[in-house]
Structures are given as C-alpha cells and as structure tokens.
A protein has these predicted regions:
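Domain-level signature for soluble enzymes in the chorismate/prephenate branch of the shikimate pathway
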Residues: 1-201
C-alpha cells in the first residue's frame, strides 16, 4: 500500500506549509533541501512532495497526492475538482486590477487585460458587464502596460510595492487569497479519521 501523500507548493508558502505538517504531528526522516522533491515520515507512513503550486491541485484531483497545501488563487483559477477542506492562516495576498499611474479612465469597454489568472479575471469583469480581451502571461505581468501589450493587468499583490516600482496603481481587488488545505474526494473518505485529528491540531 502506498503511503498517504501530501503535496506542498514550492516557494513562499513552503516553509509555513511544512510547519503546518509539524503541527499535525508529521516528522520527516530527512529535511528538504534544494534538490530533494520528496521526503517521508516512515513512522506514520506519509510521503510529502514539494512541487510547483500550479501542479498541486492536479496531483490531488488525479489521486497522485491525497492532500495538498496551496494558495486559494490557484485552486479557484483552475476550478480544480478537489475538496476545499479548510483555510490556513498564512499566504495572504490579493489578485488586483492595476493600471498605469498616468491612466485617467483605465477601466472601460473593450480593454486588453494581461494576467496569469484568465478565469478569475474574466469572471470579475463579466460580473461588471465589461468586455475585455485577455492576454495570458506566465510572468512579469507588470511590464505589459509599459510595452503596449495590455491596457491594464490583474496580478497578485501582497504589499503593492512591485506595482509602484513599475509605475502602476491599484484599482480594485478581484480575489482575496490565503493558503488552503485541499483533499482528493476518495482520499478524504479513506483517511477521514486522520484528517479529523489534523483539523483539531
């Protein structure tokens, strides 16, 4: 029987996600380092994976991992068929609309919006009755208005410092996010007793 597997998002969430597992009573035989992508708690027969945040919901939905810790922004953007078990008190950020500081009327009909989050962005503007053209990017979203690629952007924001440094102003909040503990639907039934103890940790 394969071990209970938990996928953690690499990057900013990872240290606090590991600390959360520690609160659950999970103790890894060997610590993670820059090359180690998986680690084991042999006492409890648990495997922990360190993978890209956008892959965590995929692993959990497909059953390659039983549970995962990832940002709500990723889960809601992907509309992943996973259980949203409970939010965790870290990884706070917002998906925001931002435009060049010099823009007088930035949100208008038929604007071009650059984003890494097309689903959440489309949904936000649809609810406002504004037609947009989406440009899907994978990084350096802040450069899009300056290069003429887009009129405005939606991007993750924690302090707003990066927006200001790139000559952008925050206009509206699209989505508030934090870390989320997610589960595979079948695994939740299989490991319900275990999950219940984690919820109380």
């Amino acid at each position: 029987m394969r071990p209970l597997t938990i996928a953690l998002a690499k990057g900013a969430l990872f240290p606090e996600a590991l600390a959360t597992l520690s609160k659950f009573g999970i103790t890894l035989d060997h610590p993670f380092d820059s090359r180690r992508l998986s680690a084991t708690d042999s006492k409890h027969h648990i495997q922990v994976l360190q993978i890209r945040s956008w892959d965590v919901p995929v692993y959990v939905a497909m059953g390659a991992a039983d549970f995962g810790i990832v940002g709500q922004d990723v889960v809601y953007e992907q509309q992943a068929p996973v259980l949203h078990l409970w939010p965790l008190p870290f990884g706070y950020c917002e998906l925001v609309v931002a435009a060049p500081i010099t823009s007088l009327n930035p949100i208008k009909a038929h604007i071009t919006v650059a984003t890494k989050y097309p689903f959440l962005t489309q949904q936000f503007f649809q609810e406002k009755g504004i037609d947009i053209q989406l440009v899907k990017l994978y990084g350096a979203i802040e450069m899009a208005p300056a290069t003429g690629l887009a009129d405005i952007i939606t991007d993750l924001c924690v302090t707003g410092k990066t927006l200001k440094e790139n000559g952008l102003k925050l206009l509206e909040t699209v989505f508030k996010s934090q870390a989320l503990f997610i589960g595979n639907k079948t695994s939740f039934k299989t490991y319900y007793a275990q999950v219940k103890t984690w919820m109380q940790a």
